Amino acid sequence: MVTRKGVAGFTILLALCVIVFGAYVRLTDAGLGCPDWPGCYGFVTVPQTAEDYLSVEQNFPGEIVDEGKAWREMIHRYIASLLGFLILLMFLKDFFSYRNNDGSLKDLKFSSALLALVIF
């Protein structure tokens, strides 16, 4: 059984990881390693094959793919996305707990505020 404290604790730890890794991405000047979002040069991951690089040249003229920077940026995006999903999970857990009279309104308000921050 996944407890609220366990999810909240892991979410806090992951938020710290996103902050630290975001600083690393920024300090290594990898923030534009993947210029488009949510993918990377039109791909789910960093372009890897010769065909991928041809597609990048056609769709992003003048862009040079730096795999190291691109991977750092994509990993940061993946970690941040996981954080968003954990906040959504926390909200859903609090919502259904409150609905079944097992949870508190305070917990639901807190997770609702976090979810609103992520969405907006």
Question: Predicted regions span which residues?
Answer:
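Membrane-interface loop-to-helix entry segments
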Residues: W71-L86
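Short, motif-level signal for alpha-helix interfacial/capping segments enriched in acidic residues
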Residues: T3-R4, Y53-Q58, D102
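Aromatic-anchored segments of alpha-helical transmembrane domains
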Residues: I19-V20, V118-F120
